[in-house]
Amino acid sequence: MSNPKAPTATEAAALFLSVNNIEVVYDHVILVLKGVSLDVPRGGIVALLGANGAGKTTTLKAVSNLLHAERGDVTKGSILFDGVEVQSLSPNDLVRRGCIQVMEGRRCFAHLTVEENLLTGAFTRRDGKSAIAQDLERVYAYFPRLRERRGSTAGYTSGGEQQMCSIGRALMSRPKMILLDEPSMGLAPQIVEEIFEIVKDLNVKEGVSFLLAEQNTNMALKYANYGYILENGRVVMDGEARALAANEDVKEFYLGVAGDKRKSFRDVKHYKRRKRWLV
């Protein structure tokens, strides 16, 4: 896939996040991302799709500047968040500027209560207890289930409640953009739908932008405006969400559907091997 042309000044002003041809290496040896470029506009929901190991989580960690903890480095390219080079900022500086990541696997503090977990999200704030209390109520308005479980130990809540807690904790930092990693992982379909509806509400009502890494292609494209497909550390396809959802390659490769007929896992594997655009 050819590299996208540089955006015009008007286009650049409309972008919240611009990832430009980045390469990521772990342990100075393992090349994981191989020239990834993507954009997230202000107020947009962008889906980052691909199978396990495609490079989605690494891309998010590059944006949130968390690679160093795993001996990873961006060795080529640039990442701009709201016009500022990400590599010049610490992760906590990024949070203060409005960019926060909700990690894969929820990562709640199991020994703390739900409310204590939420309050940790306000750690970088300096605007006083009253403002933080107001935002806590705002989180409970989006997640009524968390209000009911506010005094419960987070480690004893359900997977769906922990995912809600993780997103609520991110909201406590007053983010402009949330990097959301595999929100549907291990959750029942009804809970997944509920979480994605909340993501949509946050986008529409609060103006929060999202970069959403997700293996559930169908669900992600239902709520996203635009999508990028990663394979083997490269962007192999991108486009408007509706166009990707209707694309025959996407349907056959990721959804296992040819026309109206669902294919077997064996057929899908064969299809993956013979498609040249995924080399």
Task: Please describe what each predicted stretch is.
Residues 27-28, 67-70, 114-134, 142-144, ...:
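ABC-type ATPase nucleotide-binding domains, specifically the catalytic core motifs of the NBD
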Residues 49-51:
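The feature captures the beta-strand-to-loop junction immediately N-terminal to the Walker
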Residues 66-67, 78-96, 124:
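ABC ATPase NBD Q-loop/coupling interface
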Residues 112, 157, 170-171:
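ABC ATPase signature
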Residues 172-176:
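A short, proline-enriched helix->beta-strand linker immediately N-terminal to the Walker B motif
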Residues 193-207:
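Helical segment within the ABC ATPase nucleotide-binding domain
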Residues 255-279:
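ABC ATPase nucleotide-binding domains
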